[in-house]
Amino acid sequence: MIVAERVTGVARSFIHQVGISRTAWLRAAAASLLLLALPFVLRLDGRAHADWLQFLGRFHPTLLHLPIGMIVLVPVLEIAGMKRPALREAADFVLRLALALALPTLALGYMLAYGAGDTGTTVSRHMWGAIVLCIGLMLCLLVRPAWAANQQAFIYPGLLVATLIALVWTGHEGGSITHGSD
């Protein structure tokens, strides 16, 4: 019980210090829990499911390049924004748009794997990487305002780097699914 109280206290302090509204925090936590629950609710069982899932899932390769480009663009805009502040505002917009596109990309990828009955270690790693990537984007959006207001120096850049690492890893796993591991 004492550990739970300490963790709760640290979390409240962090949320207050970073300036995250309770509503935004709860929305991000709920969305993260839904993303984390997805593989357990709809297990990739190796059996093909409804054809319409596979049909919609085939749009995953079409859509996925947009959020990838936007996620890579965000740190470029943040760095360039040191000299031109308007670019920092553009970075916020691009980050929001990247998340808005990453979530349906994740859903389409899951529809493709579930509808086709795909399984395997690479598919699983790609799926979990995409989930971590989306959660990382949500966390970046939550803490970015405090960083932009110079209240927190390292949390947002650290999360952004971690999100970029998740992007590279997830993209590599997706490429291995499409083109093979060699």
Task: Tell me what each language-model feature is.
Residues 2-182:
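Polytopic transmembrane helical bundles with strong interfacial aromatic enrichment
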